[in-house]
Each structure stands twice: as C-alpha cells, then as structure tokens.
Regions:
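Lipid-exposed faces of alpha-helical membrane segments in multi-pass integral membrane proteins
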Residues: 13, 17-20, 24-27, 51, ...
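Short juxtamembrane and helix-loop transition motifs at transmembrane-helix boundaries
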Residues: 38-47, 73-79, 101-110, 132-138, ...
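Membrane-proximal helix-loop-helix units in multi-pass membrane proteins
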Residues: 54-126
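Membrane-helix boundary/juxtamembrane motif in polytopic membrane proteins
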Residues: 106-117, 130-146, 166-173
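Juxtamembrane boundary at the C-terminal end of a transmembrane helix
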Residues: 184-195
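Alpha-helical transmembrane segments in multipass membrane proteins, preferentially the mid-helix core
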Residues: 1, 65, 92-101, 117-139, ...
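Early transmembrane hairpin module of multi-pass membrane proteins
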Residues: 3-79, 170-173, 180
C-alpha cells in the first residue's frame, strides 16, 4: 500500500472520528441552548461528553500517525511519541472511571481537571511534532499548530465553565470548525500528493 493510500485512509478515519465523536455532544448542547435542560438532555449530554472525550483522544493519536506518514523522512523524538501515547492512554482510562459522573450536574471537577490536563499534554505533544515539521515539503503544517491551538482555546473554557454557564458550550462550534480546518488541510495534502 502506498504512502498516499495510507494517508487517505487515516484522514478518512480521522474525519469519521471527528464527526461521530462531536455529534454525540454537540447535538444535546444545541438543544439545551435553545430549549433548556431536562433529565433526558442531561443524560444524552453526559454520555456524549464521555464518548467525545475518548474519540478526541483517538483523533490526536491519528494525527500522530498522519504526521509520521506525511513526514516519513523525519523521525519523531522517541520520548515525545511516548508522552503522546502514554497521556492518551491515561486519559482514556480516566474517561471510563464511573467516578466521572458524566450524567450528573455535579460531574467530578477533580477528575475533569486531571483528564483534561492529561489531554493538554497529548495536544501539546502533537503541536510540537507539527511545529517541528513546519513548512517541510511546502506543506505549511504550521497551520495545523494554529488549528489545534484554536480548538484547545475553545475547548478548555467549556470544560471548566459549562456546568455553571451552559451557553458557553456553544464554543464547541468554533472548536469543531478548527477540527474541520484540520480535515481540509489533510485534503489539500492528499490532492497535492496526487498531482
């Protein structure tokens, strides 16, 4: 299988992971913002948050492998790759803990801070990789760094404040737009490789 085919498959999986994961929490957030909350919406949002927390972690692991196949002549520092993998696995394990209380109003602030701090480590690791590659092959991957920074800039306030200020959850929309930008960059790379 050629490098182009592998990248095409990885970007396809990345897109499905993004769309599937975000749909689980965006739809209940939009409904809650316009119609108010109910027990049903709270449960849907709680499950959606858990699912999207796991899928977004997988999203960053996929970005790691996309980087490796795009910049195949570059080697990711072993320590950095280990940090990305370890932090991602720790976050996924934390996401499965019932103590998260995903479907309750209270949640678990301590676990939320821990799992999102670990997620930030994963994201920073991926940011470093794309910053290292920069404009290699004329791909302008510094834009990937910008997209990830925007997504975290929108995600963190929602994580910290959405229980007290539900409408801040609408910041997940620009976060999703930043991730769509990641997908568009992938399509541009694939079309450039095909030419």
């Amino acid at each position: 299988m050629s490098k182009g085919n592998i990248l095409f498959i990885l970007y396809g999986i990345l897109t499905l992971t993004l769309c599937g994961g975000d749909a689980f929490h965006l739809i209940p957030r939009v409904i809650r913002a316009f119609k108010g909350s109910s027990d049903r919406i709270k449960k849907q949002l709680g499950i959606g948050l858990q699912v999207s927390s796991i899928t977004m972690t997988a999203f960053y692991i996929l970005l790691l492998y996309i980087w490796k196949f795009t910049f195949y002549e570059m080697k990711a520092p072993v320590a950095l790759e280990m940090v990305i993998w370890l932090s991602a696995l720790v976050r996924i394990v934390i996401c499965f803990l019932p103590q998260n209380n995903w479907c309750s109003d209270e949640g678990n602030r301590k676990l939320s801070i821990i799992r999102n701090a670990v997620f930030a480590v994963t994201g920073i690791g991926v940011i470093i990789l794309y910053a290292l590659s920069g404009n290699t092959y004329g791909y302008h991957m510094t834009r990937m760094v910008a997209a990830i920074l925007i997504s975290f800039g929108c995600y963190l306030p929602v994580t910290l404040l959405s229980k007290k200020m539900p409408k801040i959850g609408l910041l997940m929309i620009p976060k999703t737009c930043a991730y769509i930008w990641v997908i568009v960059m992938g399509l541009q790379l694939l079309f450039a490789a095909a030419c």
